[in-house]
Protein backbone atom coordinates (compact mmCIF):
# COMPACT_ATOMS: atom_id res chain seq x y z
CA UNK A 1 0.00 0.00 0.00
CA UNK A 2 2.82 2.40 0.89
CA UNK A 3 4.48 1.59 -2.42
CA UNK A 4 1.33 2.79 -4.16
CA UNK A 5 1.51 5.98 -2.11
CA UNK A 6 5.14 6.59 -3.14
CA UNK A 7 4.29 5.94 -6.78
CA UNK A 8 1.37 8.39 -6.78
CA UNK A 9 3.34 11.10 -4.97
CA UNK A 10 6.27 10.85 -7.40
CA UNK A 11 3.84 10.98 -10.32
CA UNK A 12 2.15 14.09 -8.90
CA UNK A 13 5.49 15.87 -8.48
CA UNK A 14 6.36 14.98 -12.05
CA UNK A 15 2.97 16.12 -13.36
CA UNK A 16 3.21 19.37 -11.41
CA UNK A 17 6.53 20.19 -13.10
CA UNK A 18 5.15 19.19 -16.51
CA UNK A 19 2.20 21.55 -16.00
CA UNK A 20 4.62 24.34 -15.06
CA UNK A 21 6.53 23.83 -18.33
CA UNK A 22 3.30 23.74 -20.36
CA UNK A 23 2.00 26.88 -18.65
CA UNK A 24 5.22 28.74 -19.44
CA UNK A 25 5.01 27.64 -23.08
CA UNK A 26 1.44 28.93 -23.34
CA UNK A 27 2.40 32.19 -21.61
CA UNK A 28 5.02 32.74 -24.34
CA UNK A 29 2.78 31.93 -27.30
CA UNK A 30 3.28 35.51 -28.55
CA UNK A 31 6.93 35.91 -27.52
CA UNK A 32 9.08 36.49 -30.61
CA UNK A 33 11.60 33.72 -31.21
CA UNK A 34 10.46 31.66 -28.22
CA UNK A 35 11.22 27.94 -28.41
CA UNK A 36 8.93 25.35 -26.85
CA UNK A 37 10.16 23.32 -23.87
CA UNK A 38 9.26 19.70 -23.19
CA UNK A 39 9.65 17.82 -19.91
CA UNK A 40 11.24 14.39 -20.26
CA UNK A 41 10.50 11.87 -17.51
CA UNK A 42 11.90 8.45 -16.75
CA UNK A 43 11.07 5.67 -14.33
CA UNK A 44 12.93 5.17 -11.10
CA UNK A 45 15.25 2.18 -11.15
CA UNK A 46 13.12 -0.93 -11.00
CA UNK A 47 13.48 -3.23 -8.02
CA UNK A 48 13.31 -7.00 -8.40
CA UNK A 49 11.02 -8.83 -5.98
CA UNK A 50 11.96 -12.33 -4.93
CA UNK A 51 10.61 -15.07 -2.68
CA UNK A 52 12.88 -17.16 -0.46
CA UNK A 53 10.04 -19.02 1.28
CA UNK A 54 9.71 -21.59 -1.47
CA UNK A 55 11.43 -24.82 -0.38
CA UNK A 56 12.34 -27.79 -2.50
CA UNK A 57 13.55 -30.95 -0.74
CA UNK A 58 14.10 -28.85 2.38
CA UNK A 59 16.33 -26.38 0.54
CA UNK A 60 15.26 -22.72 0.04
CA UNK A 61 14.47 -22.14 -3.62
CA UNK A 62 15.07 -18.50 -4.64
CA UNK A 63 12.27 -17.38 -6.93
CA UNK A 64 12.03 -14.03 -8.75
CA UNK A 65 8.51 -12.62 -8.65
CA UNK A 66 9.04 -9.75 -11.09
CA UNK A 67 9.89 -6.07 -11.07
CA UNK A 68 8.50 -3.19 -9.05
CA UNK A 69 8.64 0.46 -10.09
CA UNK A 70 8.24 3.42 -7.74
CA UNK A 71 6.89 5.76 -10.41
CA UNK A 72 8.55 8.40 -12.55
CA UNK A 73 10.99 11.23 -12.00
CA UNK A 74 12.08 14.29 -13.95
CA UNK A 75 14.96 13.53 -16.30
CA UNK A 76 15.47 16.82 -18.17
CA UNK A 77 13.75 19.69 -19.93
CA UNK A 78 14.59 19.86 -23.62
CA UNK A 79 13.96 22.74 -26.02
CA UNK A 80 12.51 22.33 -29.48
CA UNK A 81 14.51 24.66 -31.75
CA UNK A 82 12.25 24.20 -34.75
CA UNK A 83 11.84 27.49 -36.60
CA UNK A 84 8.68 29.49 -36.01
CA UNK A 85 6.64 31.13 -38.77
CA UNK A 86 7.39 34.63 -40.04
CA UNK A 87 5.23 37.65 -39.28
CA UNK A 88 5.40 40.77 -41.45
CA UNK A 89 5.74 43.98 -39.42
CA UNK A 90 6.94 46.44 -42.10
CA UNK A 91 9.26 47.80 -39.40
CA UNK A 92 12.83 48.33 -40.66
CA UNK A 93 14.32 47.56 -37.24
CA UNK A 94 12.71 44.09 -37.16
CA UNK A 95 14.70 41.14 -38.49
CA UNK A 96 13.90 37.43 -38.78
CA UNK A 97 16.46 34.65 -39.10
CA UNK A 98 15.60 32.07 -41.74
CA UNK A 99 17.65 28.95 -41.03
CA UNK A 100 19.88 27.98 -38.14
CA UNK A 101 21.74 30.29 -35.78
CA UNK A 102 21.15 33.13 -33.34
CA UNK A 103 21.67 36.88 -33.24
CA UNK A 104 24.64 37.61 -30.99
CA UNK A 105 23.82 40.23 -28.35
CA UNK A 106 25.88 41.73 -25.51
CA UNK A 107 24.81 42.97 -22.09
CA UNK A 108 26.19 46.01 -20.26
CA UNK A 109 28.85 43.86 -18.57
CA UNK A 110 30.21 42.56 -21.87
CA UNK A 111 28.66 39.09 -21.61
CA UNK A 112 27.55 37.52 -24.88
CA UNK A 113 24.12 35.95 -25.31
CA UNK A 114 22.13 34.56 -28.21
CA UNK A 115 18.56 35.10 -29.37
CA UNK A 116 16.20 34.42 -32.27
CA UNK A 117 14.17 37.51 -31.36
CA UNK A 118 14.95 40.19 -33.93
CA UNK A 119 12.55 42.86 -32.64
CA UNK A 120 15.24 45.50 -32.28
CA UNK A 121 15.11 49.23 -31.61
CA UNK A 122 17.52 52.16 -31.58
CA UNK A 123 18.47 53.42 -28.13
CA UNK A 124 19.15 57.01 -27.07
CA UNK A 125 22.84 56.60 -27.98
CA UNK A 126 21.98 55.49 -31.51
CA UNK A 127 22.83 51.79 -31.10
CA UNK A 128 20.69 48.89 -32.25
CA UNK A 129 19.51 47.03 -29.15
CA UNK A 130 17.09 44.31 -28.07
CA UNK A 131 13.95 45.04 -26.06
CA UNK A 132 15.99 44.02 -23.01
CA UNK A 133 18.61 46.67 -23.80
CA UNK A 134 21.33 44.28 -25.04
CA UNK A 135 23.56 45.59 -27.85
CA UNK A 136 23.13 43.79 -31.17
CA UNK A 137 26.58 42.75 -32.38
CA UNK A 138 27.83 42.97 -35.94
CA UNK A 139 31.00 42.93 -38.01
CA UNK A 140 31.96 46.36 -39.37
CA UNK A 141 32.58 45.79 -43.08
CA UNK A 142 35.15 48.60 -43.26
CA UNK A 143 37.31 47.65 -40.26
CA UNK A 144 36.32 43.95 -40.04
CA UNK A 145 35.93 44.42 -36.29
CA UNK A 146 33.17 43.00 -34.10
CA UNK A 147 31.26 45.82 -32.42
CA UNK A 148 27.78 46.97 -31.42
CA UNK A 149 25.83 48.06 -34.49
CA UNK A 150 25.59 51.86 -34.59
CA UNK A 151 22.67 53.32 -36.52
CA UNK A 152 22.40 56.90 -35.29
CA UNK A 153 19.75 58.76 -37.28
CA UNK A 154 20.40 56.83 -40.48
CA UNK A 155 18.05 54.47 -42.25
CA UNK A 156 18.84 50.75 -42.32
CA UNK A 157 18.69 48.61 -45.44
CA UNK A 158 19.50 44.90 -45.68
CA UNK A 159 20.67 43.52 -49.02
CA UNK A 160 20.53 39.98 -50.41
CA UNK A 161 24.00 39.26 -48.98
CA UNK A 162 22.68 39.91 -45.44
CA UNK A 163 24.73 43.12 -45.29
CA UNK A 164 23.14 45.91 -43.27
CA UNK A 165 23.86 49.34 -44.72
CA UNK A 166 23.34 52.44 -42.58
CA UNK A 167 22.50 55.59 -44.51
CA UNK A 168 25.45 57.96 -44.15
CA UNK A 169 27.27 55.48 -41.92
CA UNK A 170 28.86 52.06 -41.75
CA UNK A 171 27.90 48.72 -43.21
CA UNK A 172 27.62 45.69 -40.97
CA UNK A 173 26.95 42.02 -41.08
CA UNK A 174 25.00 40.68 -38.14
CA UNK A 175 27.06 38.37 -35.97
CA UNK A 176 25.12 35.14 -36.37
CA UNK A 177 26.33 32.45 -33.99
CA UNK A 178 25.51 28.78 -34.18
CA UNK A 179 26.29 25.74 -32.05
CA UNK A 180 27.26 22.17 -32.83
CA UNK A 181 25.09 20.93 -29.98
CA UNK A 182 22.03 22.93 -28.90
CA UNK A 183 21.70 20.84 -25.74
CA UNK A 184 24.41 23.01 -24.18
CA UNK A 185 22.31 26.17 -24.50
CA UNK A 186 20.68 27.53 -21.35
CA UNK A 187 17.71 29.88 -21.24
CA UNK A 188 18.61 33.14 -19.50
CA UNK A 189 15.16 34.56 -20.14
CA UNK A 190 12.39 33.15 -22.30
CA UNK A 191 14.03 33.90 -25.67
CA UNK A 192 17.66 34.63 -24.76
CA UNK A 193 20.29 31.92 -24.32
CA UNK A 194 23.80 31.54 -23.02
CA UNK A 195 26.15 29.02 -24.58
CA UNK A 196 29.75 27.91 -24.85
CA UNK A 197 31.92 27.53 -27.96
CA UNK A 198 29.79 29.29 -30.58
CA UNK A 199 30.71 28.95 -34.24
CA UNK A 200 30.01 31.34 -37.10
CA UNK A 201 26.61 30.62 -38.59
CA UNK A 202 26.55 30.04 -42.34
CA UNK A 203 23.19 28.37 -42.98
CA UNK A 204 20.83 31.31 -42.79
CA UNK A 205 19.33 34.32 -44.47
CA UNK A 206 17.79 37.39 -42.82
CA UNK A 207 14.46 39.03 -43.63
CA UNK A 208 14.04 42.71 -42.77
CA UNK A 209 10.59 43.86 -41.69
CA UNK A 210 9.70 40.42 -40.35
CA UNK A 211 9.79 38.64 -37.00
CA UNK A 212 9.93 34.96 -36.12
CA UNK A 213 6.97 33.91 -34.02
CA UNK A 214 6.96 31.43 -31.15
CA UNK A 215 7.02 27.78 -32.24
CA UNK A 216 4.66 26.66 -29.46
CA UNK A 217 1.98 24.22 -30.61
CA UNK A 218 -1.03 25.90 -28.98
CA UNK A 219 -3.59 23.13 -29.56
CA UNK A 220 -1.12 20.41 -28.58
CA UNK A 221 -0.10 22.27 -25.41
CA UNK A 222 -3.72 22.86 -24.34
CA UNK A 223 -4.57 19.20 -24.94
CA UNK A 224 -1.53 17.99 -22.99
CA UNK A 225 -2.28 20.45 -20.17
CA UNK A 226 -5.83 19.10 -19.81
CA UNK A 227 -4.52 15.53 -19.81
CA UNK A 228 -1.94 16.44 -17.16
CA UNK A 229 -4.66 17.89 -14.91
CA UNK A 230 -6.73 14.70 -15.29
CA UNK A 231 -3.74 12.51 -14.39
CA UNK A 232 -2.96 14.73 -11.40
CA UNK A 233 -6.53 14.46 -10.12
CA UNK A 234 -6.50 10.67 -10.59
CA UNK A 235 -3.35 10.40 -8.47
CA UNK A 236 -4.95 12.66 -5.86
CA UNK A 237 -7.87 10.24 -5.58
CA UNK A 238 -5.48 7.29 -5.17
CA UNK A 239 -3.68 9.08 -2.33
CA UNK A 240 -6.97 10.00 -0.66
CA UNK A 241 -8.10 6.37 -0.84
CA UNK A 242 -4.82 5.10 0.62
CA UNK A 243 -4.92 7.77 3.34
CA UNK A 244 -8.48 6.80 4.27
CA UNK A 245 -7.54 3.12 4.40
CA UNK A 246 -4.48 3.77 6.58
CA UNK A 247 -6.59 5.85 8.99
CA UNK A 248 -9.12 3.04 9.21
CA UNK A 249 -6.38 0.48 9.91
CA UNK A 250 -4.87 2.70 12.59
CA UNK A 251 -8.29 3.17 14.19
CA UNK A 252 -9.00 -0.56 14.23
CA UNK A 253 -5.59 -1.34 15.74
CA UNK A 254 -6.26 1.24 18.44
CA UNK A 255 -9.67 -0.25 19.25
CA UNK A 256 -8.16 -3.75 19.59
CA UNK A 257 -5.76 -2.46 22.20
List the predicted regions and their residue ranges.
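Amphipathic alpha-helical polymerization modules
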Residues: 1-257
Amino acid sequence: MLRGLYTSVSSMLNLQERQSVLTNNLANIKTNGYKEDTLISKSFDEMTLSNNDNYKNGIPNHQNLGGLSFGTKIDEVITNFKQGSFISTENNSDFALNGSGFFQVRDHDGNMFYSRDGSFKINSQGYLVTNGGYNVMGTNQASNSTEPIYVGNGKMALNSSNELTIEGGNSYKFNIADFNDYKGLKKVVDNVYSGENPVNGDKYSIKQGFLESSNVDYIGSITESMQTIKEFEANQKVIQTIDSTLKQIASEIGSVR
